[in-house]
């Protein structure tokens, strides 16, 4: 089993109407990747698509993928444009991961050393930090 230390939130930095198929095509044909960029991707309506299981390594943050799980919302081209449904879906994904990996740190792609990106266009740790309390309450009770 992989040692998970980071739960990383991303944006696709694309328009909201971008399809998952076109994102996958970009990874494969445009970037030459053999695996996907994220474990889960969230459409504007909040639909969560699983692209890889937790035991698989994806291409989310260079140098940190072996110990990270990655979730992305479609959007975030120039600003944080998450829909309410995407905000809620991200929280649900992170909560389910925290229940399995309670010591993992929630962070954004931009929070890693040497990353020169705004992704995910907001402070993920600040926004979703309350989930740590939820997990701790569940584990203690």
Predicted regions span which residues?
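Short, surface-exposed glycine/acidic/tryptophan-bearing loops
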Residues: 54-70
